[in-house]
Design a protein with these regions (language model features):
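Active-site region of PLP-dependent enzymes
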Residues: 21-29, 37-147
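Short, conserved loop/helix-junction motifs that constitute active-site signature segments
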Residues: 7, 34-36
């Protein structure tokens, strides 16, 4: 990741880190998703992942402009921020569509399902690590090289 990050700075491209299977993981002592070497990190909450919300995912970034753009896109490109509007706000209830966007908002029920599992994420990661250790041992005893 460090080399990819260096190349991105040298050649001017962005890095999106796919951490779909890495919720709760660490790399070089830092939490995966901290965007140390990427502009955005994405996680999946599909049912086969460590944490599930039945569908959906999460994106993290340290870049405020990227975060603002993601917030806008997730909600049909709508804003209530008067500084971004092209005309004067008519009141607190007023909103404006300033960009094309999508409906990428998770339902409250799906979010609650995901949040309820967060207390157990360390245990889930530990259990997966234990299982991986068993596979490593069995493959080693079988004379197979694991890449």
């Amino acid at each position: 990741m460090k080399k990819i990050s260096s190349l991105s700075k040298e050649y001017g491209f962005s890095v999106i880190e796919d951490a779909s299977h890495a919720i709760g993981g660490r790399y070089q002592g830092k939490s995966i998703g901290c965007c140390q070497y990427s502009d955005i990190t994405v996680f999946s909450f599909h049912p086969v992942k460590i944490i599930t919300t039945a569908e959906g995912g999460l994106a993290t970034t340290n870049d405020v402009s990227i975060a603002d753009k993601m917030k806008s896109l997730r909600s049909h490109g709508i804003t209530r921020d008067t500084s971004l509007m092209t005309s004067v706000s008519e009141g607190d209830w007023y909103y404006q569509q300033i960009d094309l966007g999508f409906n990428y908002r998770m339902t409250d029920v799906h979010a609650a399902l995901g949040v309820s599992q967060m207390k157990q994420v360390d245990e889930f990661v530990r259990r997966r690590s234990d299982i991986a250790g068993i596979y490593d041992k069995e493959f080693k005893d079988a004379g197979l090289d694991v890449l």
